[in-house]
């Protein structure tokens, strides 16, 4: 058993280091004799510790248990009241505490003042501006660092340097925290007024960020960056991240391309040895110099010096240091402003009449035409999704807030809730449900607001609109997205592509006679100037579309959509300011509508087209590509002469002048070699991603448990690591120990072992080996997996009560009735389950389930009870396959150049040997014929799990399933009687397995699984025609080979001799695989 259990045991000795502390390991085994020894061992340990005897003798006596059984958990207890943090901290608090400069930030409350100065009384106090929003505490974080430091104080050589660097930085944190005392968190991991009143307001979030940074220090450069950010972020809570990361938008334009990858006709990345020189006008250097001066003004010294040293020769070899600075800047934590300031920010912009009306007209027309183009086909053909738009909206209604708390009755139970789904049910039950009337959002009914916080930018506000807006927009937006899916211009939505494809698109046309224009339009999206032309363009488009059909229901759908736009042109918002709620007329576009992403993309495409059409009057060029990706847009322009400094300068100034004529406050840049947008940046022909995910501070609180957050923490660590920001793995593991431990009583705690946290069960939190997803196949692993499956889903009394009420039942049956033309249990049960699952976002229900889960878990971690189950997991399948494979050594040469320099070496090696992929593997069954058939006639979207169930039914059951969803009998018959149906069986099984094996997550998403280089390492003689079996054998083999290579940096080849007799058995088993949802899979999904 791995490193985790070792560290766990050391950690417990470190934390509970008093005389009265005891650690009792609990073992289990799938072998019944050994299991009995485990039980004996455990009861004797308890006996001895009750009588205050040593456990040493038992460890010898039961060495068979310790050697052969598997560690399940460690029970630890200590009668010491645990103020150990303060005591240990003193040892490190030898430095000079930081003093906050209280004049750095423009807004008074962003200065790191003593809390009672910002909030004189407990009533005025709010933690919302500094809440770390994570279910772990500052004291735990301090403990984790001190544990690491104590464990490594005797390191030698290079490791000693790392120790010294971290110790030095921790001294700053420890001294500052110690000066005021460690803030004690409450049961909800929040910091109350009483605790904070005599301490600096931002102390906790600053200390968390600082710990995250110092535990990510390895090299001397890391140390310099971290030190500077830690010291300055103590005072500067507003602009630091922005200052440090601003230069990147120019740096990418300075590096020559010497060999790069481009997208070829087959949408694959292909190496091109082209050389493109960076042409940089003096003006650009002046702007860069200005940015660096601004950094110095803010007190930065080392970081600007690093940038200036790099500027001497602008080499791609040293560029990773620039990438590192850019990533690190985000780790200073979130900027959390007051709602009032966030809202006023958009309204501060001076509204001028002095704009180019002609350009606005063009912009509006382009939006109109694009909306028409997107919806023309579905409208002309009276698409059923547009006819049944209301039902489609209800089926995908989220359980987010509807903006106000209401009292709702479900049967005899009365509850208060803000959730949309509950409001809809309640309104239907009480005859208040009127989706045909879109409520106004004017001065009489202003919009409540949510918030979005992000490091390095100001807080943005989010509209929380009534659910009628969602229902009105859902179907139309879905149709827009379908159009965007097969339109290359929409980089974000383009069919199954990933960011590597977009990278190859840009580099493809870069040459000595081309330049690329890239613009960050986030300011424009939320500006007042955008709102009228934007909404009007959409309205005009909808008007034109309404004339293309005679179907009353389609016209109604378009009209309701139009009404949402009309209402939003006169929007007011409500902002709590102290005790009063202010109403403000808000004339800008904010997120919160269903259309936000799609409509912004349309508008940004229209914007760049407008600008290009203007500058084409002055310059002659061909537009090779136009792309829009979220808040950014970029275009590659090809000229008929070689690009010169003067040309770049002229185009740049013309572009800026053009934007200015629309009064668009955007950051537009022109370069010949690279771009920088929010999602990715390209420099020297290589692609980089910002590794800026915060680990110890979260944006907001949700209703996830500590286990969920531990999994998210690990997942964030992995993503950062792939992007070039590595945090010490021991530290991450220590955090996982802290966050997954379960308190039994005040002095008694249970710490699950590595086996519990890494086996793919409903409790999985992390992988024992980074980047490698293991599916345990040993007896003990399968045993524990079975044990956990027995307690996977927990009941909730409140949820059952709500689900039994007539309000709920009538709602579900109403949906079923509208959807189905005949009885269909699978779908009806599916809808009921989905609706019931949506109730989980109601806190009392999730709390109730959590409590049940914890108590079941506690029992299980002390003695696993396995159960005989007909359920088969992917582990069972792999366990059957494994014995038939034989391994031999192999050799694969490195044959591809690096194009993603930030990748860890072991992952990079694999891409260099087998190549990368530019597409997502389809894992939701949407490409199957049955899925397409259903979406042709029904608004219902079955999940991959449901398709997997359905496709394995008898043919007549499949027919009934289809007919009940409104598919004509003739189509259903044709489907079942055709070859397509048997292809579907295979295709859906394939999708389902890909889905189970997380093939589109982690680093697996980077590898080309169909690489001929990988294929040639696998030999599986072809026996009998069962494609599904050959598929699973190949996939298993590929994962084995890749996992081995990640771990060992060398290749193996696999030979499989699978007996024909076993094939049919395996094939039958493959139709019974259960999917396991765990905090780990949720965290992966959350990354999306």
Swiss-Prot record:
One of its GO terms (cellular component) is virion component. Keywords: Magnesium, Nucleotide-binding, Nucleotidyltransferase, RNA-binding, RNA-directed RNA polymerase, Transferase, Viral RNA replication, Virion. It is found in: Virion. Its EC number is 2.7.7.48. Its main location: virion. One of its GO terms (molecular function) is RNA binding. Its cofactor is Mg(2+). It holds the Pfam family Rotavirus_VP1. SUPFAM superfamilies: DNA/RNA polymerases. PROSITE patterns: RDRP_DSRNA_REO. One of its GO terms (biological process) is viral genome replication. Transmembrane segments: none annotated. It catalyses: RNA(n) + a ribonucleoside 5'-triphosphate = RNA(n+1) + diphosphate. Residues 501-687 form the RdRp catalytic domain. RNA-directed RNA polymerase that is involved in both transcription and genome replication. Together with VP3 capping enzyme, forms an enzyme complex positioned near the channels situated at each of the five-fold vertices of the core. Following infection, the outermost layer of the virus is lost, leaving a double-layered particle (DLP) made up of the core and VP6 shell. VP1 then catalyzes the transcription of fully conservative plus-strand genomic RNAs that are extruded through the DLP's channels into the cytoplasm where they function as mRNAs for translation of viral proteins. Belongs to the reoviridae RNA-directed RNA polymerase family. Interacts with VP3 (Potential). Interacts with VP2; this interaction activates VP1. Interacts with NSP5; this interaction is probably necessary for the formation of functional virus factories. Interacts with NSP2; this interaction is weak. This is RNA-directed RNA polymerase. The lineage of its organism: Viruses, Riboviria, Orthornavirae, Duplornaviricota, Resentoviricetes.
């Amino acid at each position: 058993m791995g490193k985790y259990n070792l560290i766990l045991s050391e950690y417990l000795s470190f934390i509970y280091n008093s005389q009265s502390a005891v650690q009792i390991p609990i073992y289990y085994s799938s072998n019944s004799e050994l299991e009995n020894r485990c039980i004996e061992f455990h009861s004797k340990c308890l006996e001895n510790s009750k009588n205050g005897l040593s456990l040493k003798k038992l460890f010898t006596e039961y060495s068979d248990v310790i050697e052969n059984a598997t560690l399940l958990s460690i029970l630890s207890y200590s009668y010491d009241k645990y103020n150990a943090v303060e005591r240990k901290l003193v040892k490190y608090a030898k430095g000079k505490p930081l003093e906050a400069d209280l004049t750095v930030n423009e807004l008074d409350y962003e200065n790191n003042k003593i809390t009672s100065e910002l909030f004189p009384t407990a009533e005025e106090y709010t933690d919302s501006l500094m809440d770390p929003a994570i279910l772990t505490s500052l004291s735990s974080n301090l403990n984790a660092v001190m544990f690491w430091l104590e464990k490594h104080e005797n390191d030698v050589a290079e490791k000693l340097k790392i120790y010294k660097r971290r110790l030095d930085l921790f001294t700053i944190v420890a001294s500052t925290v110690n000066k005021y005392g460690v803030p004690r968190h409450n049961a909800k991991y929040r910091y109350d007024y009483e605790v904070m009143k005599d301490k600096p307001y931002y102390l906790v979030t600053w200390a968390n960020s600082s710990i995250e940074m110092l535990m990510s220090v390895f090299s001397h450069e890391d140390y310099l960056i971290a030190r500077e950010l830690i010291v300055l972020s103590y005072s500067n809570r507003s602009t630091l991240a922005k200052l440090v990361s601003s230069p990147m938008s120019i740096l990418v334009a300075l590096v020559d391309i010497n060999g790069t990858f481009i997208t070829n006709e087959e949408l694959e990345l292909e190496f091109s040895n082209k050389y493109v020189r960076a042409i940089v006008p003096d003006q650009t250097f002046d702007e860069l110099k200005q940015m660096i001066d601004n950094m110095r003004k803010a007190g930065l010294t080392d970081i600007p010096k690093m940038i200036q040293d790099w500027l001497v020769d602008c080499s791609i070899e040293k560029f990773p240091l620039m990438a590192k600075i850019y990533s690190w800047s985000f780790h200073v934590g979130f900027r959390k402003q007051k709602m009032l300031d966030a809202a006023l920010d958009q309204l501060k912009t001076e509204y001028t009449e002095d704009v180019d009306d002609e350009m606005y007209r063009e912009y509006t027309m382009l939006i109109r035409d694009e909306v028409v183009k997107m919806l023309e086909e579905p409208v002309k053909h009276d698409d059923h999704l547009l006819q049944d738009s209301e039902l489609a909206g209800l089926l995908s209604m989220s359980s987010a807030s509807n903006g106000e708390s209401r009292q709702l009755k479900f049967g005899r139970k009365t509850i208060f809730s803000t959730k949309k789904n509950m409001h809809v049910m309640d309104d239907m039950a009480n005859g208040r449900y009127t989706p045909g009337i879109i409520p106004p959002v004017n001065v009489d009914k202003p919009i409540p607001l949510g918030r979005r916080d992000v490091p390095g930018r100001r807080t943005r506000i989010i509209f929380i609109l009534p659910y009628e807006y969602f229902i009105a927009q859902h179907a139309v937006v879905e149709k827009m997205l379908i159009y965007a899916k097969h339109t290359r211009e929409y980089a974000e939505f383009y069919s199954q592509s990933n960011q590597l494809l977009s990278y190859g698109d840009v580099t493809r046309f870069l040459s000595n006679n081309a330049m690329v224009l890239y613009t960050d339009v986030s300011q424009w999206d939320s500006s007042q100037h955008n709102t009228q032309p934007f909404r009007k363009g959409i309205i005009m488009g909808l008007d034109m579309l309404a004339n293309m059909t005679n179907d009353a229901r389609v016209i109604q759908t378009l009209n309701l959509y139009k009404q949402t736009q009309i209402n939003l042109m006169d929007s007011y918002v409500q902002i709590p300011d102290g005790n009063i709620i202010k109403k403000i007329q808000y004339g800008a576009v904010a997120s919160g509508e269903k259309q936000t992403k799609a409509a912004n993309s349309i508008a940004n495409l229209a914007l760049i087209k407008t600008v290009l059409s203007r500058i084409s009057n002055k310059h002659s060029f061909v537009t090779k590509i136009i792309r829009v990706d979220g808040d950014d847009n970029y275009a590659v322009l090809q000229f008929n002469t070689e690009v010169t400094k003067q040309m770049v300068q002229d185009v740049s100034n013309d572009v800026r002048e053009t934007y200015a004529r629309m009064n668009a406050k955007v950051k537009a840049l022109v370069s010949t070699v690279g771009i920088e947008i929010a999602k990715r940046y390209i420099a020297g022909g290589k692609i980089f991603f910002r590794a800026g995910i915060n680990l110890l501070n979260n944006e907001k609180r949700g209703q996830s448990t500590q286990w969920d957050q531990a999994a998210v923490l690990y997942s964030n660590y992995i993503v950062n690591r792939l992007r070039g920001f590595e945090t010490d793995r021991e530290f991450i593991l220590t955090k996982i120990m802290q966050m997954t431990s379960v308190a039994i009583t005040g002095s008694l705690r249970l710490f699950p072992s590595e086996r519990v946290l890494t086996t793919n069960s409903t409790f999985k939190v992390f992988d024992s080996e980074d980047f490698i997803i293991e599916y345990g196949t040993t007896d003990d692993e399968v045993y524990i997996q079975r044990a956990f499956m027995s307690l996977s889903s927990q009941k909730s009394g409140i949820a059952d009560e709500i689900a039994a009420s007539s309000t709920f039942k009538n709602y579900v049956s109403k949906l079923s009735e509208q959807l189905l033309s005949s009885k269909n249990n699978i779908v009806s049960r599916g809808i009921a389950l989905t609706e019931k699952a949506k109730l989980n976002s109601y806190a009392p229900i999730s709390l109730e389930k959590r409590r049940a889960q914890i108590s079941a878990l506690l029992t299980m971690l002390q003695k696993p009870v396995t159960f005989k189950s007909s359920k088969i997991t992917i582990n069972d399948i792999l366990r059957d396959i494994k014995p038939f494979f034989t391994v031999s050594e192999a050799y694969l040469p490195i044959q591809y150049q690096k194009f993603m320099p930030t990748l860890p070496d072991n992952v990079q090696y694999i891409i260099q040997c087998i190549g990368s992929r530019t597409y997502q593997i389809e894992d939701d069954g949407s490409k199957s014929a049955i899925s397409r058939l259903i979406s042709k006639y029904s608004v219902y979207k079955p999940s991959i799990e449901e398709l997997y169930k359905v496709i394995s039914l008898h043919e007549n059951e499949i027919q009934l399933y289809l007919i009940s969803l409104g598919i004509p009998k003739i189509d259903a018959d044709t489907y079942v009687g055709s070859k397509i149906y048997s292809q579907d069986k295979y295709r859906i099984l394939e999708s389902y397995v890909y889905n189970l094996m997380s093939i589109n997550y982690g680093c697996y998403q980077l590898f080309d699984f169909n690489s001929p280089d990988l294929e040639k390492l696998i030999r599986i003689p072809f026996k009998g025609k069962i494609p599904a079996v050959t598929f699973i054998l190949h996939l298993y083999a590929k994962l084995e080979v890749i996992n081995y290579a990640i771990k060992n940096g060398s290749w193996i080849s696999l030979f499989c001799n699978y007996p024909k007799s076993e094939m049919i058995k395996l094939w039958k088993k493959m139709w019974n695989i259960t999917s396991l949802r765990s905090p780990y899979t949720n965290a992966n999904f959350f990354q999306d």
